[in-house]
Regions:
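Extended alpha-helical interaction scaffolds
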Residues: 1-431
Length: 431
């Protein structure tokens, strides 16, 4: 950045001056007599003057079509009526902004604790606060875009990449530090609460549903609070999906597994808190099957009794009655009386029952859920959700893990951040 913004030694300035000189080859300015004759012809001819006179482009040259965007940036193509994307874009303004960034980074480097000051600088961007570096990045991207598609590669190399490289120098250690903070404050507690518990694992131990809500609830959940507090500047929501900010996240490499995980939990939150309170509403319809004369399904105190009558929808809510948690299914065949298919105790009993069946999607909101009884009879229900996959979304948590890295960073940056965090912890202990 020092070399690029040096008015005497800058290779960028030298290159742009050369391009401007070459681009103006063969240009001819319109003389005073030509201008008077043209105005007279317009008056005599009575032609309406266009809103944008495409012929009034200042000096004309054979290379204008190719070098026009660069000449406009350098102020070498300034006809009075020429159409310009933005008169405020100029190479001099860009270099002034680069100098401001360089001075800011030099200030960080000469601080008593450069690592801490650099993390503070990066954190302002993570939290959505504007700084000189990101403003200049955006200005460079705007200049690159204003040059047009033919010059896009040149514009990116000259005006975007130098600042991106400088930004990466700031971001890498800070991203590693944020990874460590995410791992300690969120992931560690998540694993303590849910590892080895149903529905995350095939286990007899149940995960706490209120604790799951504590993590995934929209806006007030632990995950949303962390993301909106620490990453508001580089990550935002579009609908229910978390999406990286295309401008401020330049130089950052988000861990794809992290984005998939938080978006899966965000969708689950929408399903689990559709009406604001914790719970999932859905409908069930029993289906007639051969050799079965009656089924009785109980879900948290809510009963669906079917004895081969005309099938009808019945509404359910899970969790239902908290004093009667669990699911129980009995069936009666033509050859025997009522028998117990399964009794699933606890809050997650209904989800455990669903986990035992086979699921076939019929359309966007309906699934056929089938169970094979010990006598090889098939017991079937159609499940209709109100949003997304309904209660079946909870089965997708099997094998789910919350990644401990938000960003993909190199090992050196990770080691540097961990060492800095260790020093901070040691100082806190001394105090």
């Amino acid at each position: 950045l020092t070399l690029m913004s040096d008015i005497r030694q800058s290779p960028l300035i030298a290159l742009m001056n050369t391009l401007a000189w070459q681009g103006q080859t063969g240009q001819q300015s319109e003389g005073l007599s030509d201008s008077i004759i043209k105005s007279a012809k317009d008056l005599v001819g009575g032609k309406d003057k266009p809103a944008i006179d495409q012929s009034a482009t200042g000096p004309q040259g054979p290379l204008d079509e190719t070098f026009g965007p660069l000449l406009q940036l350098l102020g070498k193509n300034t006809g009075s009526n020429v159409m310009s994307a933005d008169n405020s874009l100029s190479l001099q303004t860009y270099l002034t902004r680069v100098t401001r960034v360089r001075l800011r980074l030099q200030q960080v480097a000469s601080a008593s604790d450069p690592q801490e000051m650099m993390q503070t600088l990066a954190q302002t961007v993570f939290q959505g606060k504007s700084v000189d570096l990101t403003d200049t990045q955006q200005y460079g991207s705007l200049i690159s875009a204003s040059l047009g598609e033919e010059w896009s590669g040149f514009g990116s190399t000259m005006f975007v990449q130098p600042l991106t490289q400088a930004w990466e120098t700031v971001l890498q250690p800070s991203a590693a530090s944020l990874n460590d903070k995410w791992s300690r404050s969120v992931v560690a507690n998540w694993r303590t609460a849910f590892d080895g518990r149903f529905p995350f694992a095939a286990s007899k131990s149940d995960a706490s549903l209120p604790m799951l809500a504590e993590f995934i609830r929209k806006d007030s959940g632990r995950i949303d609070r962390f993301l909106t507090t620490e990453l508001n500047g580089v990550l935002h929501k579009e609908g229910s999906q978390w999406v990286p900010d295309k401008v401020n996240s330049q130089g950052l490499s988000f861990n794809p597994a992290f984005l998939r995980a938080i978006n899966q939990l965000s969708e689950l939150s929408d399903i689990l808190f559709t009406d604001g309170s914790q719970g999932i509403s859905f409908d069930l319809q029993a289906r007639p099957v051969p050799r079965v004369v009656e089924t009785q399904l109980t879900i948290d105190g809510q009963k669906l009794h079917y004895f081969n009558q005309m099938a009808d929808w019945q509404s359910f809510r899970w969790p239902g009655d908290t004093y009667k948690p669990g699911a129980m299914l009995t069936w009666t065949s033509v050859n025997a009386g009522a028998r117990l298919f399964g009794d699933y105790r606890g809050t997650w009993g209904f989800i455990r029952w669903l986990d035992q069946g086979k699921r076939q999607q019929l359309d966007r909101s309906q699934w056929m859920v089938s169970f094979t009884a010990p006598d090889d009879s098939t017991l079937q229900w159609v499940l209709r959700s109100q949003l997304g996959n309904g209660p079946l979304a909870l089965l997708a948590l099997r094998g789910f893990t919350l990644p401990d890295q938000i960003f993909s960073v190199d090992s050196a940056a990770t080691a540097q951040a961990l060492m800095a965090n260790t020093e901070i912890s040691d100082m806190d202990g001394i105090e």
